[in-house]
Amino acid sequence: MSGQTLTDRIAAAQYSVTGSAVARAVCKATTHEVMGPKKKHLDYLIQATNETNVNIPQMADTLFERATNSSWVVVFKALVTTHHLMVHGNERFIQYLASRNTLFNLSNFLDKSGSHGYDMSTFIRRYSRYLNEKAFSYRQMAFDFARVKKGADGVMRTMAPEKLLKSMPILQGQIDALLEFDVHPNELTNGVINAAFMLLFKDLIKLFACYNDGVINLLEKFFEMKKGQCKDALEIYKRFLTRMTRVSEFLKVAEQVGIDKGDIPDLTQAPSSLMETLEQHLNTLEGKKPGNNEGSGAPSPLSKSSPATTVTSPNSTPAKTIDTSPPVDLFATASAAVPVSTSKPSSDLLDLQPDFSSGGAAAAAAPAPPPPAGGATAWGDLLGEDSLAALSSVPSEAQISDPFAPEPTPPTTTAEIATASASASTTTTVTAVTAEVDLFGDAFAASPGEAPAASEGAAAPATPTPVAAALDACSGNDPFAPSEGSAEAAPELDLFAMKPPETSVPVVTPTASTAPPVPATAPSPAPAVAAAAAATTAATAAATTTTTTSAATATTAPPALDIFGDLFESTPEVAAAPKPDAAPSIDLFSTDAFSSPPQGASPVPESSLTADLLSVDAFAAPSPATTASPAKVDSSGVIDLFGDAFGSSASEPQPASQAASSSSASADLLAGFGGSFMAPSPSPVTPAQNNLLQPNFEAAFGTTPSTSSSSSFDPSVFDGLGDLLMPTMAPAGQPAPVSMVPPSPAMAASKALGSDLDSSLASLVGNLGISGTTTKKGDLQWNAGEKKLTGGANWQPKVAPATWSAGVPPSAPLQGAVPPTSSVPPVAGAPSVGQPGAGFGMPPAGTGMPMMPQQPVMFAQPMMRPPFGAAAVPGTQLSPSPTPASQSPKKPPAKDPLADLNIKDFL
C-alpha cells in the first residue's frame, strides 16, 4: 500500500471507527495511488449496492465528497468508481444518482500540482460531464441505454416511432458526451485514466448498439411516417452518420491501446443511395403539402393518429398563419438536436397534436384529464411523446400555439379539463399535451432559468401557461445542449435543475407539473404565450382559487413524474380533483418527506417540494392540503434522508417558526446527533426522525411510512414555557399518550389531532394555569413557581427539559429511571416526582422514539447533565442511572417550579 498517503490511511481509519464499512471501501478505492481502483474494493461496493440494508445515498455522498478532493488522482478515481457502480452495481445506484439535483460539479476542476495534473484535469472535466449526462438520460428515459436489451427484439428496435423520435436525441447526447472524452493513445499514461477509458469504451459499444437499433427502427418505418416525423428521422439519420465517423475514431484508439480486436466491432456505413432515397421521399411529402397546404398534409398526419381528427382542418388554417414560425416543428424541436424543423409548422403543429393525441392526449380529448394520464402512463409516452420532446418541443409549440391562443385560451385553461371540445380538440390537445410534456419537460429542463421558475412556482396553476412554463423551462436552456446538465452548471442549474429555484414561493405544484402551475403572471413566457396566458388568466384565476393547493388537479396528476416507476403512469388522478394521494409515494426516490401526505397540509410549507427532488408528492402534496395544520414541520426533517443534500428544509417557506424548528431539527438529525439534540428548537416529531434514521432505502424508494400527522406539532410555538410541555407533545403521536403531562381532555384532543396548533396551545396554557380557567390555582402556583425560578434553578431546568424533549433524547435509560413517575399519569399523584418525569416527557418519548436517536442522546446527556446537577436533583434524575424511587424523593426540593404548577393544576 505504498501508494497510499497518510491522509488516505487516516480517512479509512476514521470510517472504520464510525463503523461505515461502505465509506471505508470508498476511501480505499479512491486513494492517492496512481492506479485504477482495486477490484476488491469495487467488488465490495457493487455487492453493497445489492444489499437491502446499505445506504445508497450515503455511498454516493461519500463518492461525491472524494470527488471534491484537490488531487486529480482522488477525483479521477472517484469518478471511475462511480462509473463502475453505475454500470455494474444495482440499478438503485444509478436511480439515486438520476434523482439528485447535482452530481459532479467539476466543470472548473484544475489540479495545479504539476503538469500531469493539468493534463488529467482536462479529462476529469470531460469524464464528469459524461457521467452527469449518463445519469440525466436515465432520468429522462427511466432506463439505462447500456443495460437494455439490444437486437431485433430489443427496446430501441421495438419502440414506437413517436417515442423513438424523442429518445434518439437523448441517446445522441449521451454518445456525444462520451466521444468528447477525446483521448489519444499517448495520453493513456497511467492506470487511472486507463480504467476510465476501458469503462468508456465498453459504454460506447453498448450505446452505439442501441443507437444503431434505433436508426434501423426509424428507417424501417420512415415511409410510413408523417412529414414532420420524416423530417426529424432524416435529421437523426444524418447525425448518426457523422457520429459513426467519430465512433470509429474512438475505436481506433482502443485498438491502438491494445484492446483485443475481437472486442471492437466493425462499422460499415449504409450506401449513400439510402440517404438519397430518404430525401426524395421527404421531398415528395413536401411537394404535396404546398399544393394542398393543409388538405393533404394535415389530414394524413391526423388520419394516422386519429382519422376523426382530420376535421381539425379549421385549426389548420390558424396553423398556416403559424407557418411563419418555421423552426417550430414539434418533432424537430423534440429532437432538440434538430433545429431543422423548417417544415411549415402549420402542418407540423397539427401533426404534432394528433401524434400526441394518439399517444393519449387526443384520444383523451373528450375525457381529457384522465386519458392524458393514461396515455402518459406508458413510459414511452412520457419519454417519447410528451415529456422528452416537451423540453424542446413545448417551447416552440407554445409559440406556435399562439395563433390558437385566442381560440384555445378558454380551452387551454380547461385544457386537460375540457379538452373534449371537438373544435379545439387539436389545440386543446396541444395544451394538454404540453402539460403532460411539461411533466418531464419542465421538471428536467427546468433549470427553468431560475427566474422563470419563480414565476412558474407561482401558486396560480394556470393550465394554459404550461406551454409557457415549458417554454420558460427550456428557454435558452436546451436540455440536450452540451453545456446544460453538465457538471458545469451552477448548483442551482444543477445537472437536472429539475427543482424550481427555492425562491419560488408557490408551493403549489411547482415541480411536478411545473408547466401547468405556471401562473399566467409568469413574465417569462414568450410574448405570444403571454397573450394566451393573459386571455386564460381570468379563467385560470378562478380555477386556481378552486384548486389552490390542489394545484390544478390536472396539473398535479403529472406528478406521476417519478421518473422511475409509476413515474410513467401519470395516474388519471390528473382529472381527479385534489386527490391527496395523487401519485403519492410513487417516487422511487421520494423520501418520507415526499410520501408523507401531511405535508400538503399547508400550501406554504409545501414549498418543501424543492427539497423533494423527485418526490411526486411534492407536487401532489398540495392536494392533501385539506388537513390544514398538518403542514408538518417534519417534512424538511424527512428530507434529511439524503443528508440535507437538497438543503430544502432551509429554503422551505414554511411558517417562519415551523421552518426554523423543522429545518434545524431535521438538519441536525443527520448533521450530528449530539448537536441536534442540544438544539432547543428541534421539533419533537419523532416519527419523521425515525424514518430519517432508517436505512433510508425505504424512505428513498417511497416505501417509508408517512410520518404520523400527529407529529405535526410545532414545538417552536411554545417558546419558553412550552419547552417543558413540549416533550409531552412529542410523544403525542406515540403509543403511550397516557404518560403525557397534560391530563386535561383538551390537551389529549390536541395531541391526537396535532393539527390545530392554536387549540393545543390553548390547552397547554390551561394546564400551566396561566389561562383564566385555573386562575386561582395557576396564580398561586405561578407566584410560588416564580420564587423558585429566581432561585437559580430557573435557567437550568427550563433549558434542559426543552433540549431533552426537542432532541428526542428519551433514552432507554431515562425511561427506566423515571418509569413510575412518567408512566403514571401525572394527575395520579407523585406530585413532584410525577411532574418532572411528565414534564420532561422522557418515558413517553422513549417508548415512541426511534432507538437510533436515543443512543446519540445518551452521548449528549453528559453535556446536559452538569447543568441538571447544578440545578438540583431533578437534573440527576434525568441521568439514566439513578433509580426512579430514590430520585423522586430528592426531586421535590428542587423540582421545577413549572412542574409543580402542572401537578397542582392536575390535582
Curated annotation (Swiss-Prot):
GO molecular function: 1-phosphatidylinositol binding; clathrin heavy chain binding; phosphatidylinositol-4,5-bisphosphate binding; protein kinase binding; SNARE binding
Biased composition (Pro residues): 516-525
GO cellular component, one term: synaptic vesicle
Domain of life: Eukaryota
Keyword line: Cell membrane, Coated pit, Glycoprotein, Membrane, Methylation, Phosphoprotein, Protein transport, Transport
Modified sites of kind Phosphoserine: S296, S300, S306, S313, S596, S602, S623, S629, S763
Domain observations: Possesses a three domain structure: the N-terminal 300 residues harbor a clathrin binding site, an acidic middle domain 450 residues, interrupted by an Ala-rich segment, and the C-terminal domain (166 residues).
Function comment: Adaptins are components of the adapter complexes which link clathrin to receptors in coated vesicles. Clathrin-associated protein complexes are believed to interact with the cytoplasmic tails of membrane proteins, leading to their selection and concentration. Binding of AP180 to clathrin triskelia induces their assembly into 60-70 nm coats.
Protein name: Clathrin coat assembly protein AP180
Organism of provenance: Homo sapiens
Lineage, opening ranks: Eukaryota, Metazoa, Chordata, Craniata, Vertebrata
